[in-house]
Amino acid sequence: MIAIQGATYIYPGSTVPALEKIDLAIEPGEFLAITGPNGSGKSTLARLLNGLLRPRQGRVLVDGMDTGDDTALITIRRRVGMVFQDPDNQLVAATVAEDVAFGLENLGLPPAEIEKRVDLALRSVGLEDLAARPPHLLSGGQKQRLALAGVLAMEPRYLVLDEATAMLDPVAREEILEQVLRLRQEQGIAIILITHLMEEAVRADRMLIMKSGRIFWQGSPRELSYQERILAAAGLRLPAVIALAKSLRQGGIKLATNPVCVEELARALWKLASRE
């Protein structure tokens, strides 16, 4: 479990807390989405999770290890993998396979173990046929999948995606999200999704809204998505699917469920059409 206890963070040169008195527990295997407007503190919170930033007050514990303990940082950063918005900042080698192997080589693992992990990681993101390709020749979506493979090769227990799909087109964005959800199901990795896209956030088990460096709301996305006042107060909008479902109801179409994604809306409409 990742436990954040009374964490406050102030950036150097500032007097205004970027995060203030944050208390949060992230369970192994869960899918947590953290959203909020720009400047709300969500990316700062992401960087606390593996010790890239350390709280000015309070503490962050990863499976009982304190991120303030220098001797625990290497282990913590292996447990909590991070994928950022711009994949080019995480790609360092001449070929796809070498890039995935880079972090493993720094751990001093045997060559056979490195080869095994690289192969498994590339297969898990669908890049096994591109192992010898230079990273700069990949598309944006492929680069992000490569960055993800490099993190997965380290065998993390928690995977933090910090706006990792923000620079991708809708098709590539959906591919990345689907792969991450599949990995969670197959390997039990906890997913912490930092996003400003409500369409992504509502797919999580639990959603947390940040506002002005504090936790403004947390709970079930399905519960939140039909409370427009909470969303408006946080500077967020209804996801497109939920807005469409609302319009359909206002037009007299009685849906049996409250869909939060395209697949759920399609099923609800199919059931409605089948009854008629």
From Swiss-Prot:
Chief place of localization: membrane
EC number: 7.-.-.-
Molecular function terms from GO: ATP binding; ATP hydrolysis activity; ATPase-coupled transmembrane transporter activity
CDD domains: ABC_cobalt_CbiO_domain1 (cd03225)
Coiled coil location: none
Binding site residues for ATP: 36-43
Location relative to the cell: Cell membrane
Entries under PANTHER family matching the protein: ENERGY-COUPLING FACTOR TRANSPORTER ATP-BINDING PROTEIN ECFA1, HEAVY METAL TRANSPORTER
Subunit organization: Forms a stable energy-coupling factor (ECF) transporter complex composed of 2 membrane-embedded substrate-binding proteins (S component), 2 ATP-binding proteins (A component) and 2 transmembrane proteins (T component).
Role of this protein: ATP-binding (A) component of a common energy-coupling factor (ECF) ABC-transporter complex. Unlike classic ABC transporters this ECF transporter provides the energy necessary to transport a number of different substrates.
Family (UniProt): Belongs to the ABC transporter superfamily. Energy-coupling factor EcfA family.
Protein known as: Energy-coupling factor transporter ATP-binding protein EcfA
Species of origin: Moorella thermoacetica (strain ATCC 39073 / JCM 9320)
Gene designation: ecfA
